[in-house]
Amino acid sequence: HEAGHYFAARRYGMRVIRFSIGFGPTIWKHKPKDSPTVYQVALIPFLAYVQIAGMNPYEESDPNDSGSYANASLWARIVTIAAGPLTNYFFASVLIFFGLLIGGKEVADETSMKVFVEAGPAQVAGVQTGDRVLAVNGQDVHTWEELRRSVSAHPGEAIDLAVDRDGQTMHETVTPGPRGDKDEGLIHVRMPTHVQAVGMREAATMSVIAPPIFVYENVKAIGRVLSGKEKLQVNGPVGIVKETARQAKTGPGVLLQFLGMLSAYLGAFNLLPFPALDGGRLLFLGAEAISRRKPDAKIEARIHAVGLLMLVTLIACVTYADVFAK
């Protein structure tokens, strides 16, 4: 993400003062000869930043300084800010491409009535992953569509689920939960999957379409949370590290795909029109393009400072929940 900002700024002749991985006390830094940029690694690794000359309105600046962000053209500033999220999407596609080539893709096995049990009513009732569904309320089911229809018809009503477990027929009483705001039942089981090899062309296609689809699904999920249809579930830095470690155990291909989706999400998050985020800065640049007049740089800086404080507070609260509330 920050590399995108860095290379775009350099492309338009802006002077990059600092490229930092992490923030807080510096533990390593290097300034190449004849370079204006200090490259550093800081103690707290959860954030990174690029310091570009002229972005801080409280610093002394020369109106004739061609290396200053403040003196760059509107287009150069828009590209420099947008380059971060766009790099996230590009990096996401690269990671997903190689992840698919290495690890393949998961394909649902619709011919098997064996279930993979997720957290929900079926798990609570005692249904186990690997059970093969035989019948619902005495009615035989032979396809996943028949199972879906049988369960959907009984939201909030106890049903008798007959399953084959290691050659023995078991009967579990399951009460389907609601499917969002629909009057349909859901017991949270899904088809078993198997890994299928992916060729170069398919991997390339999927690597392009997967990031926007992932972001779209997350936007829909946020909408369901805001409408009260689902509970908010947020992972902070600690939770993300834990999930990354969990994905790593499944293999390098799956890990690369997960990191690709994470990169896409980071890019989308940074495009939100919120102060301190790239989307917030693009909002000010858009206003400048429409009004043909620069906003007061110091007022804009104060707004971004408030936004940054709010984001840091949010990250701290989510991190606390990751560590102590889970």
Predicted regions, residues:
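Small-residue-rich helix-interface/hinge motifs
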Residues: E2-P63, L262, L272-S291
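Conserved PDZ fold ligand-binding element
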Residues: A122-W144, I303
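Transmembrane helix-loop junctions in multipass membrane proteins, especially transporters and channels
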Residues: R10-M14, L100-A108, G228-L232, V323-K326
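Hydrophobic membrane-targeting alpha-helices
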Residues: V94-I102, G267, L271, I315-D322
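Internal alpha-helical transmembrane segments
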Residues: R11, I44-S112, L255, H304-T313
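Residue-level signature of catalytic and energy-coupling elements of molecular machines
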Residues: H1, V41, G84, L147, ...
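Functional transmembrane alpha-helices
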Residues: N64-W75, P176-A268, G280-V306, T319-K326
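PDZ-domain C-terminal substructure recognizer with occasional recognition of PDZ-binding tails
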Residues: Q128, L134-A135, R149-P192
